[in-house]
Amino acid sequence: MAKEDTLEFPGVVKELLPNATFRVELENGHEIIAHTAGKMRKNRIRVLAGDRVQVEMTPYDLTKGRINYRFK
């Protein structure tokens, strides 16, 4: 799948779940399950509840996503 096929939304981390997954509430009100991107894991960027993040999602499954940026 090409990079252009992804959708990006800002959101807020609501809850930390097992296996490095998070419950994220998007700005449009939807709640999704997201995991951190590999570069964030590699660089040991911590994501905690209440953090503002950018979530990347595929148009095929709008209930799961990948956190690719944590806003400062």
UniProtKB/Swiss-Prot annotation:
Where does the S1-like domain lie? 1-72
**Sorted alphabetically, which PROSITE patterns does this protein's record hold?**
S1_IF1_TYPE (PS50832)
Tell me the SMART domains matching this sequence: S1 (SM00316)
Which InterPro entries did the record assign?
NA-bd_OB-fold (IPR012340), RNA-binding_domain_S1_IF1 (IPR006196), S1_domain (IPR003029), TIF_IF1 (IPR004368)
This protein's assembly is summarised as: Component of the 30S ribosomal translation pre-initiation complex which assembles on the 30S ribosome in the order IF-2 and IF-3, IF-1 and N-formylmethionyl-tRNA(fMet); mRNA recruitment can occur at any time during PIC assembly.
User: Mind telling me which NCBIfam families this protein's record contains?
Assistant: infA
- Protein name per the record: Translation initiation factor IF-1
Species, as recorded:
Ruegeria sp. (strain TM1040) (Silicibacter sp.)
